[in-house]
Amino acid sequence: MRRSEVLAEESIVCLQKALNHLREIWELIGIPEDQRLQRTEVVKKHIKELLDMMIAEEESLKERLIKSISVCQKELNTLCSELHVEPFQEEGETTILQLEKDLRTQVELMRKQKKERKQELKLLQEQDQELCEILCMPHYDIDSASVPSLEELNQFRQHVTTLRETKASRREEFVSIKRQIILCMEALDHTPDTSFERDVVCEDEDAFCLSLENIATLQKLLRQLEMQKSQNEAVCEGLRTQIRELWDRLQIPEEEREAVATIMSGSKAKVRKALQLEVDRLEELKMQNMKKVIEAIRVELVQYWDQCFYSQEQRQAFAPFCAEDYTESLLQLHDAEIVRLKNYYEVHKELFEGVQKWEETWRLFLEFERKASDPNRFTNRGGNLLKEEKQRAKLQKMLPKLEEELKARIELWEQEHSKAFMVNGQKFMEYVAEQWEMHRLEKERAKQERQLKNKKQTETEMLYGSAPRTPSKRRGLAPNTPGKARKLNTTTMSNATANSSIRPIFGGTVYHSPVSRLPPSGSKPVAASTCSGKKTPRTGRHGANKENLELNGSILSGGYPGSAPLQRNFSINSVASTYSEFAKDPSLSDSSTVGLQRELSKASKSDATSGILNSTNIQS
């Protein structure tokens, strides 16, 4: 049993006791029955009114709860609709009081969410408005009267974040462009003269509208200023170039040049003005020194002609070059020609540089070719001979590659310009072919000269004898082996040798001219055959080394037809007798023969012990 039911029974018991107590009191007092009835009726009435009042109050409470439930349910549905959430559903059976409480709690929660969303929406709208005003962009389209959903709020947040990033990037770009604009204005000595320029340079950076239009206008302004700066720099550089040319033409002293060194850098307006004043001064000075200037221009013209590989006909086509009436019109013609040549060279600079590279490579190749044919290259070479050969081989490979590359580029140029590219009045490949042909002819001519020289030298040796220089070191005597030793009859020289040539005085082996040997039958001697174009092995060795061309002494050997045939070697006795005759002649004995005397003295001692050496007899 519920406690409320127990309390109700207790209330009934209390009421019964109270009525019984009233009856007892009435009996003791002696109240008649009719009055008891009235009094009981009053008690009943009071009790009933009290209970009715209590019941009415509880019924009122019930009605209020039911009404509250209805109101909360209605408001909750509205909030769920505004907040875009599912409607509230009560789980299971519940009392009116609990239902009202649950609905009221849910309504309060929904109201709180609605308030938070409205506050966040308001904050985002304020940020969006501020950013859009700075960026000059339209506001975010959202209904501020309705409650935004979570998705709508998330999108709004992302939009505001994007606006912040856009603002940061545009601000960075604005600051960078502004800095460059200020530098350009300072370089140009330019002061802001429009409202936009003043807003950019003078106003606060945070107050500047970072719209796309303003950024584009900023970029345009920067391009204009940079173009003005570039033009100003180009003008100043042109004025400086003009000043240097005028200095060189007028031969201005270095002291005077250093006086204006401060304006030879920079491109500000005051620098440009000072440069123009200097040019005007030099131009006036140029007019006063017309002849000197024109001659300087002519020197420069020749340099450009050389760089452009002009032929003699092309150079002669400029008739004013030889004129001697030094007037202003002549100077203008020369200036115009210089400008034309400069432009022509700059347009075709790559081709001219390629041809110049080929020319330099060709000259270097010819130099190595000359060194390769020089007999002196074998003396005092210091290890350079191999390097030169490698470089010459490298150049031989490089030249055809350069020629092919230039040929392709020149053909492309000729197709574009519909005219021939000339080098010294010829097409480039014709010029190259001519250079190779001239080189081949020069080599052929040199070869023929060497052959003719060798032929003449051989004929001279046949008539007068040869005297190759012996090495500084004496070769050791070969062992006298039975297989190689030849027994030679050695005789002393007869008096007939007095008819022969003068004996050698500077040392070395004596080679007499070959003569025909008399036949055993005593018939006439056979005439010696003349030397053909081929070199003998001795002659080849003689021409291959410079040392063989430089004689330590002079040899005049006897070569008349009646002399006996001479062999290649002399006996020690023959050499010794020759030296004894040489020593008797006071006109030939001098300090230069001291070394020879020592050598012959050693040879005489060696002859006494070594027996017969490889030698030849000189017969009368």
From Swiss-Prot:
Phosphoserine modifications at: S513, S571
Stretches of the chain forming a coiled coil according to its record: 96-133, 211-304, 383-463
Encoding gene per record: PRC1
Domain writeup: Microtubule binding occurs via a basic patch in the central spectrin-like domain and also requires the unstructured C-terminal domain.
Entry keyword annotation includes Cell cycle: yes
Region (Spectrin-fold): 342-466
Source organism (scientific name): Homo sapiens (Human)
Tissue-specificity statement: Overexpressed in bladder cancer cells.
UniProt record, GO biological process: cell division; microtubule cytoskeleton organization; mitotic spindle elongation; mitotic spindle midzone assembly; positive regulation of cell population proliferation; regulation of cytokinesis
Keywords of the record: Cell cycle, Cell division, Chromosome, Coiled coil, Cytoplasm, Cytoskeleton, Microtubule, Nucleus, Oncogene, Phosphoprotein
General function of this protein: Key regulator of cytokinesis that cross-links antiparrallel microtubules at an average distance of 35 nM. Essential for controlling the spatiotemporal formation of the midzone and successful cytokinesis. Required for KIF14 localization to the central spindle and midbody. Required to recruit PLK1 to the spindle. Stimulates PLK1 phosphorylation of RACGAP1 to allow recruitment of ECT2 to the central spindle. Acts as an oncogene for promoting bladder cancer cells proliferation, apoptosis inhibition and carcinogenic progression.
Recorded consequence of changing T470A: No effect. Abolishes CDK1-mediated phosphorylation, leading to prematurely recruit PLK1 to the spindle during prometaphase and blocking mitotic progression
GO cellular component terms, A-Z: chromosome; contractile ring; cytoplasm; cytosol; intercellular bridge; microtubule cytoskeleton; midbody; mitotic spindle midzone
Residues modified as Phosphothreonine: T470, T481, T578, T616
Protein name, per record: Protein regulator of cytokinesis 1
Region of interest (Disordered), residue spans: 446-488, 517-545, 600-620
Domain of life: Eukaryota
Result when mutating T481A: No effect. Reduces in vitro cyclin E-CDK2 phosphorylation and causes extensive bundling of microtubules to the mitotic spindle
Entries under Pfam families matching the protein: MAP65_ASE1
Compositional bias per record (Basic and acidic residues), positions renumbered to this chain: 446-459
Comp. bias intervals (Polar residues): 606-620
Family designation: Belongs to the MAP65/ASE1 family.
Location(s), subcellular: Nucleus; Cytoplasm; Cytoplasm, Cytoskeleton, Spindle pole; Midbody
